[in-house]
Regions:
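Catalytic machinery of carbohydrate-active enzymes
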Residues: 1-308
């Protein structure tokens, strides 16, 4: 029995995309032990996925804690590392493992024993890149996020009386404020949807509080799921929604993975070929500055895409 370590940190969108290859890896190594190295904020996500024999936390802190993590990994006597993060930090880890062990390493870094070299000019999407990487190990890939396991907490659709509804995802992390379309614009979209007898459902969590409160102050006829929209609920809603509109943020990847048609509002800080969700159900409007995107332009896009 082999011991296999996956490494995955990053944003929620990265984590959601990585479930595609994590599922492929699990199907391939059916008789082996699989561990994952991740940050504390995604511990529960991977615990609920229920694929791993051990979850090891690496919050990427100071040198002393990092040494402790590396020692822990050495003690596990790992046979194969599959680096799904491919960062400068994990490249350092690979360098150390190459010096002091015979562990096989699959990744994009120069110290990988089974290295995937990608075209840096025409970079693949996250899912395609990771899929290409693990195919070097002989793993068959499906290239689709694996998320059906999320549906544990059931959403009560009686709350919306069988109305047609549309998901509104106005949030974004504070550090990515340049990817955030103004809340007042989302409020106008909500008003427009109401005029078409389509219920806007607003999703979001703590970081989105200010934006959601502003929307609610301008348009009250919405279903407000602020702090009531965990990933499983978003996934269920996405499967039945007419569509969704969103900034470039983690939940957009989840919505797109459900098959829901989603229209993204983007600035030049979003790479449409590599970072945003890919698929025929994903469309976008993009300008250098996101604040220059007009509500009227988005409404026209929604009419064309969703026949509202």
């Amino acid at each position: 029995m082999k011991k296999i370590l996956l490494i995955k940190h990053g944003s929620l969108g990265d984590i959601i995309s990585s479930t595609s290859v994590i599922n492929d890896i699990k199907k391939h190594f059916t008789k082996d032990q699989i561990y994952i190295l991740t940050s504390d904020k995604f511990k529960d996500f991977f615990y609920e996925l229920n694929f791993f024999d051990k979850i090891i936390i690496d919050n990427r802190e100071d040198i002393f804690k990092t040494i402790g993590v590396i020692k822990k990994l050495f003690n596990l006597k790992i046979d194969l590392i599959i680096d799904l993060q491919n960062s400068k930090r994990t490249s350092v880890y690979a360098f150390i493992f190459r010096i002091f062990s015979k562990i096989k390493i699959n990744g994009t870094g120069v110290f990988s024993t089974h290295r995937y070299k990608y075209d840096k000019i025409n970079m693949p999407s996250v899912i395609d890149g990771l899929s290409n990487q693990i195919e070097i190990l002989g793993i068959t890939t499906l290239r689709k996020p694996y998320l059906n396991w999320l549906i544990k907490e059931k959403f009560d659709f009686n709350k919306i009386n069988n109305q047609n509804f549309f998901l509104i995802n106005p949030g974004c992390s504070k550090k990515n404020f340049k990817k955030k379309w103004p809340a007042v614009n989302y409020a106008k979209i909500c008003t427009y949807l109401n005029s078409k007898n389509i219920l806007p459902i607003i999703i979001g969590a703590n970081e989105d509080k200010v934006e959601i409160e502003e929307i609610l102050s301008l348009e009250k006829n919405v279903l407000n799921l602020f702090n009531k929209s965990p990933l499983g609920i978003i996934f269920q809603l996405s499967q039945k929604a007419i569509g969704a509109i969103s900034n470039d943020t983690g939940p957009a990847h989840l919505i797109a993975a459900s098959g829901c048609s989603i229209h993204l509002i983007l600035s030049d800080f979003s790479n449409t070929k590599t970072v945003i969700p890919q698929g025929t159900n994903v469309t976008f409007i993009k300008k250098k500055e996101i604040t220059n995107i007009l509500v009227e332009e988005v409404i026209e896009d929604l009419n064309n895409k969703f026949d509202i």
